[in-house]
Amino acid sequence: MRKIDLLSASAMVSVAAMPAYAQTGSVTSSQNSAPTNGPGQEVGTSTSQADARGYADIVITAQRQSQRLQDVPIAVSAFTAENLERQQIVNPLALQQTLPNVTFTKGQFATNTFTIRGIGDLCVGVTCDSATGIALNEQPVGGRILEGEFYDIERIEVLRGPQGTLFGRNATSGVVNIITAKPDLTKISAAGEFEYGNYDSKRVKGMINLPLTDTIGVRVAGYYLNRDGYIKNTYTNTSFDGRDMYSFRGTLSWEPTPDTRVDLIAYYSKEDDDRSRLQKQLCDRDPTGILGCLPTRRAFGTPNANATLGGATESIQGLPLFLADASVTLPTSNAAYVPTFLATLAGTRPLLAPFGLGSIGSPGIPATPDAFANAINIPDFRTVTADYLPTWKTEDQIYTLKAYHNFGNIAVSLTAGHSRSKLNATSDYNLAVSGLGANAPGFATLEAVGNPASPLYNPLFAGLRNALIPNGPAGGVCQSNGGPNGVGVYGGETIGCFAQSLDFDRSVADSKSWMGEVHVDSSFDGMFNFLLGGIYTKAVARDIDYYVNNIGLDYLSGLVGTISGAGAGRTTSSFLASPFFRSNSDRFELDSYGIFGEAYFEFNDQLKLTLGARYNNDKKYVRARTTFANALLPVGTTDANPAFDGGGADFDATIPGIQPWAEARVRYSRMTGRAVLDYQITSDNLIYASYSRGYKSGGINPPLSPLFAVPTTFRPETVDSFEIGSKNTFGNGSLRLNVTGFYYKYKDLQLTRIVARTSVNDNISANIYGVEAEAIISPTPAFVINANISYLRTEVAQDRLLTNPRDVSGGRDDAVIIKDLAGAYNCVVLPTTAGNAAGSRGFVNASNALLGLNGTVPLLSNGTYGAFSACKFLQAQQLATGAPVSVLLDGNPVNVKGNRLPNSPTYKWSVGAQYTIDIGNFTLIPRADLNYTGDQYGTIFNLNPIDRVPGYEVVNAQIQLNGPEDRFYVRAFVSNLTANDAITGLFVTDQSSGLYTNVFTVEPRRYGIAAGFKF
């Protein structure tokens, strides 16, 4: 038996170099087929085993052993640096186009997701774990690294399918492992490249390799990217979503003996530009304002702002209901609730009438135009009209120490790592320009009563006036800058004063992690070998915040606060802190450890068996709260946190008493494992069958009002994977063909939805199956074709009732959809007897008459009606009167059984070809690639056509001229040749934002020229 090299073994996964084109395959525990590499060598291609076509066998360590790719059964796609260059794979978005059953798209809240075989990062939140393991130099890292670009890469390997036994707790979909180039101790070398392209794109990459002694070497690499934005902004006649970023990496390697190697790697990246987390928002405008956007199609419209928190709640109808809802603390089952609510409502309306609030329409008060009535949404995916330009600032550091020593038949590998990541990003929340609208007269009134020079001056309003309009209404309205003090404009924290409302959000995060792993493996000559290891991970994040603000929220906070303060006897202005929405995860902690091992049985030269097991243990803690208009404070307060911390508001309604934070701890443990049986028919043909179990830990949902039936936690997910495959080489190497079939039984798959402006997560079970075929065809040594095709079927396997936020009626035409004017969410009224539409409408009409609101109006094309009202009041009124209806505060759920999982295209294929032409000492290599991704759905509800993402294709081409011995080269390229604006993914916002759809697309057509050198 040959010695097994575990030089590259690590915390997540180890891989090896590939030939000069994409190579895919499936991996086995065939130890005796593994080439021998000393610790001073890179595990990579085996030139001694090169076939007649001239491309070398690929050696990988995906099972923590050096093995030929064609000998091992885990579906793997691998890319060398040369391959990345020739297929124009500069970032993960381009990478996914060439992979079977893999998609990658941007997501909501500054996130992104890899989806492998239908399993992706559908869980959004501080305590969520990624379903796809991401590793840099085999150290687990966060997904932020996927926002950068690839440089000085030795190889990238994507493992498809659960990898939990060897690679950890959160690899249920697979692993993406990025291996950077290491120092060469034998020679000095350097490389550099400059690229210029459209969008005034300038990209510089370089590296230098220096052997310091015979046993010590250093390698330094870096890149810089600067380009204009892809998104045109007609409001400013500029563009945004540009890049200004750089990264560098240093690697120090020490090989004191042939059996020992130590690598120390330091990585740093920084970005400061106008990258946008949003690209385009689509909406089929709802003329009633009850939904904002209709659940029919994705159109180039704008939401009806009357459906938003700033439009519905800050109306002359909504604000009194907001005050009454906040003041009446009786349960809706109390007989006194309805009369108390109506009395409170009657007392607040006269106080608010002079302040120029907008109107959604009610008896005697006609509707006023909503804030987006004149907003423009240009019908182009890369053109917007926005008055707030995004900002994006990130800083990442990753440090890795790897040590390996071979004691003979036993080898020990150690990996230790530390990382830190910071994010501070803002963006226009609605990608639209909205004026002050109906609030403008209110600011004139505020000037009249708050300016000491006015004959109507009242000192009660002076502080409110000075904070919002210190220069009078003509000088613009000052707006809060969302920050941790929670005071905004009323504590002097403002972004400026404007003639329109700047609707924007802000994401902030600061996280650290530490990990350590050790494993021991054997290389005995008998039929039995083993691997044993353990890993510990600790992560801490603080002040993970998400803010949303506009002038309407500032005005609501100050106006309601001042009136409430007057009711409490105050004679000066007050406000309700915070005057903006803030989801604040003050602290998150993760402690995780795993113990794993595998046993390898080689019965003969053809038949092998692998048995593995892993124990996972995860502990999570989070302290969080969501603030908006919670604590009454005097204007001029500079920090609202003492009020929040001191009992000024209750942030955990699930626990009796006043809680300053919602705190929760969870602990999960699971056993996972795998069994693999492979049979080598010939040296060129392998078949295998495997079973594996993957696991991803559960987590904690953000704190929400108990009005919404949202569980406090979400469960861990597990997947049982069954896979068969065959790997083949034919025609003396002219064809390599690998085929894999798989079936997954998924339990408690985590997926997210937006409730009350917050991501919450649910669990479902699913069945997944599919087939993948991958081929490399080389008719001649100069002509190479690579191709792959995949089929994927996913479906929810259980009866699971979930409420679709787009349509809380659940498709029933006898329902009445309610826009709650106190909180801007949607509830639904259903008749007790199905089909009794008159009963549900009659109940709402009678109740709204008591509230002074209009009755029901036609809303959806199927006959469903809607109305503005107060959901809690309707619930109390039903209990008081016994009306034959049900009031469902979180909507009427629908059964999603049989629906497809999001981001799971049924068909996906790609084909690429390159031809090498010798011209004297030069070579000319033209290449073209065609990639197709089939249709998919963006949500679990599978509504047609609004949730459907159509299939699309991307065409890339380039031609490169290499100098003698490849010392220099010149390359011309074009990516997305047809300028396709295809959608890669979508996300539906929540009801208080109007239910518009954020969509994300492929990158636009790029073209340019690059020149580089190597020595």
Question: Can you say where each PLM-predicted feature lies in the sequence?
Answer:
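Acidic, small-polar-rich N-terminal luminal/periplasmic segments of exported/outer-membrane proteins
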Residues: 46, 53-185, 724
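Outer-membrane beta-barrel translocator/receptor signature
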Residues: 129-131, 143, 151-154, 160, ...
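Transmembrane beta-strands of outer-membrane beta-barrel pores
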Residues: 194-200, 224-228, 268-272, 407, ...
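Solvent-exposed loop segments that connect transmembrane elements
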Residues: 231-239, 276-385, 430-504, 546-585, ...
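Structural signature of Gram-negative outer-membrane beta-barrels, strongest in the C-terminal barrel
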Residues: 255, 520-523, 529, 533-539, ...
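Membrane-embedded beta-barrel scaffold of Gram-negative outer-membrane proteins
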Residues: 404-407, 411-417, 424-427, 686-696, ...
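C-terminal beta-signal and adjacent terminal beta-strands/loops
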Residues: 794, 931-941, 961-1015
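C-terminal beta-barrel architecture of Gram-negative outer-membrane proteins
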Residues: 827-868, 887, 901-963, 975-979, ...
